[in-house]
């Protein structure tokens, strides 16, 4: 049925993380910039094997691989990578049940996010960019309670109970996928958050894998300097026993400075400059409960991830012309 809109093989971006870690928020910004017509967007929750009532009755959590049709998600990702349409299942989080299947057509960019996109070697090999979201645990809990109690029909106490039940499966099946990520993104509460309790001003660390393709952000870091403490810092730190490049985004960054840095980052992506929205207006959007907010640290994080994706697109195009 459908086919990709160019002769180039689709680029697949896998975004992994625990429940409530911000996967949808991160990927929604990417879709808004690239455009719905260029992106096939898949939430792997659609591949749950059991509905909510069955999981509660049997005690199996959605984090357990046995509660997900990993074979089908792998086959569907293979089809999309070949430029073929799929008929995919649909899981409705509001009801905890399955809706009617839907057709998903391939596109230039395929964004797949969920609990298990890096779970096995075949899934990892299908994806070109691997991202793991790893917010500090207190934030993860806050985000999950806020989301599930406002839009997914749970009470706060039910969410707390579910988090306790899921802790073991997270440790066994979700967190080990972190080791396969090209970029680990960690949101944390910094000085401005503690003064204001404002989720729009979180600190962010982007930790690159040792063998991940490098992109040059030295001019972005230089442009971020404003007095003694730059808004962005590029460091080499030990992570999991290995030296890693770490980009830190300070939650205190001003909107004006964030827009200035946006200019510098977009200058690296001249081949897709036509996609550029107004100053961060399509990026950094997140829901605090039912209220739509905007965060400059989140916007810059999404833009840097976009830069990685565009860089990988250029690499793939160069390889195909050889």
Residue ranges and their predicted role:
Residues 26, 30:
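Hydrophobic positions on the alpha1 helix immediately C-terminal to the Walker A/P-loop
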Residues 23:
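Conserved lysine of the Walker
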Residues 19:
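The conserved Walker
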Residues 3-10:
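Phosphate-binding P-loop
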Residues 3, 147-322:
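C-terminal accessory "lid"/substrate-recognition subdomains
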Residues 12-14:
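Short hydrophobic/aromatic beta-strand immediately N-terminal to the Walker A/P-loop
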Residues 36-43, 49-98, 109:
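Conserved nucleotide-sensing/catalytic segment adjacent to the nucleotide-binding pocket
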Residues 101-149:
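ATP-dependent NMP and nucleoside kinases share a basic, alpha-helical "lid"
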């Amino acid at each position: 049925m459908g086919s990709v809109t160019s002769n180039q093989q689709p680029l697949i971006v896998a975004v992994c993380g625990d429940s409530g870690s911000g996967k949808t928020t991160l990927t929604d910004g990417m879709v808004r910039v690239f455009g719905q017509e260029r992106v096939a967007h898949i939430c792997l929750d659609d591949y749950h094997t059991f509905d909510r009532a069955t999981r509660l009755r049997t005690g199996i959590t959605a984090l357990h691989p046995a509660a997900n049709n990993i074979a089908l998600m792998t086959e569907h990702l293979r089809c999309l990578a070949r430029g073929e349409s799929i008929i995919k299942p649909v899981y409705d989080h509001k009801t905890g049940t399955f809706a009617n299947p839907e057709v998903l057509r391939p596109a230039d960019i395929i964004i797949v996010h969920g609990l298990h996109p890096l779970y096995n070697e075949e899934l990892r090999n299908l994806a070109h960019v691997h991202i793991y979201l790893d917010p500090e645990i207190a934030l993860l809990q806050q985000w999950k309670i806020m989301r599930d109690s406002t839009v997914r029909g749970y009470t706060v106490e039910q969410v707390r109970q579910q988090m306790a039940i899921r802790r073991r499966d997270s440790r066994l099946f979700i967190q080990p996928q972190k080791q396969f990520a090209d970029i680990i993104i960690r949101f944390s509460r910094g000085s401005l958050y503690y003064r204001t309790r404002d989720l729009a001003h979180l600190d962010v660390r982007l930790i690159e894998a040792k063998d991940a393709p490098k992109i040059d952000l030295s001019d972005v870091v230089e442009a971020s300097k404003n007095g003694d403490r730059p808004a962005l810092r590029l460091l080499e730190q030990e992570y999991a026993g290995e030296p890693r490049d770490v980009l830190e985004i300070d939650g205190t960054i001003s909107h004006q400075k964030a827009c200035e840095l946006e200019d510098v980052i977009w200058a690296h992506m001249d081949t897709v400059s036509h996609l550029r929205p107004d100053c961060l207006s399509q990026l950094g959007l997140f829901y605090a409960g039912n209220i739509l907010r905007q965060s400059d640290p989140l916007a810059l994080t999404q833009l840097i991830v976009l830069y990685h994706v565009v860089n990988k697109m250029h690499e793939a195009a160069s390889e195909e012309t050889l």
